[in-house]
From Swiss-Prot:
Protein name: Small ribosomal subunit protein uS2
Lineage: Archaea, Methanobacteriati, Methanobacteriota, Thermococci, Thermococcales
Organism: Pyrococcus abyssi (strain GE5 / Orsay)
GO molecular function: structural constituent of ribosome
Sequence similarity: Belongs to the universal ribosomal protein uS2 family.
Highest taxon, organism lineage: Archaea
InterPro entries: Ribosomal_uS2 (IPR001865), Ribosomal_uS2_arc (IPR023454), Ribosomal_uS2_CS (IPR018130), Ribosomal_uS2_euk/arc (IPR005707), Ribosomal_uS2_flav_dom_sf (IPR023591)
GO cellular component, one term: small ribosomal subunit
């Protein structure tokens, strides 16, 4: 059914996908559900869910190896790495070396056909190079992000450990489903925990 969520609403909320920041840009206004008394902006999970469906269909059209997912943010590094393993996409967790997409002399030079950015602000170098080579940009965007040059925005908490794991897990499942590699979403047996950055307590 078109009006069903990709995962139960409670799962989105438990992962904190809806939790924004205390800053809001004009660009993100359409994705904001409400503002809490403490000044925290809350994202509209229905719109997150809708955009994940669109992104899954869009990304499924690309050759898996021509997709690049990046995350400088610590909590996004395990999710993009696992996303790459599951979908066949290229992943760059951690520091993005300048020239990776623009300078053939760089050791791991790679020119993707589409890029997934975990946070346009933190991943500014990858964003800049994607703009330079003119490829579509799919970005996870929080309440304080700008949408300039973003072709497909997925509104979400793009800093939280559980939120990032869930978003990349859903995206991986949607891509496989839309490619026809699984015939139903229930066939996707990889637990969401495998996408989650583990916290090592000393």
């Amino acid at each position: 059914m078109a009006d069903e969520y990709l995962v139960p609403l409670d799962q989105y909320l438990a992962a904190g996908v809806h939790i924004g920041t205390q800053q809001k840009t004009k660009d993100m206004k359409k994705f904001i559900y409400r503002v809490r008394q403490d000044g925290l902006y809350v994202l509209d999970v229905r719109k997150t869910d809708e955009r994940l469906k669109v992104a899954g269909k869009f990304l499924a059209r690309f050759d898996p190896q021509s997709i690049l997912a990046v995350s400088v943010r610590l909590y996004g590094q395990k999710p993009v790495k696992k996303f790459g393993e599951v979908t066949g996409a290229r992943a760059i967790p951690g520091r993005f070396l300048p020239g990776t997409m623009t300078n053939p002399a760089v050791k791991n030079f790679f020119e993707p056909d589409v890029i997934i950015i975990t946070d346009p602000r933190a991943d500014h170098q990858a964003m800049k190079e994607a703009i330079e080579i003119g490829i579509p940009i799919v970005a996870l965007v929080d309440t304080e992000n700008l949408l300039s040059y973003v072709d497909l925005a997925i509104p979400t908490n793009n800093k939280g450990r559980k939120a990032l794991a869930l978003i990349y897990w859903i995206l991986a499942r949607e891509i496989l489903y839309n490619r026809g590699e699984i015939s139903s979403r229930e066939e996707f047996k990889i637990p969401v925990e495998e996408f989650e950055m583990k916290i090592v307590r000393r």
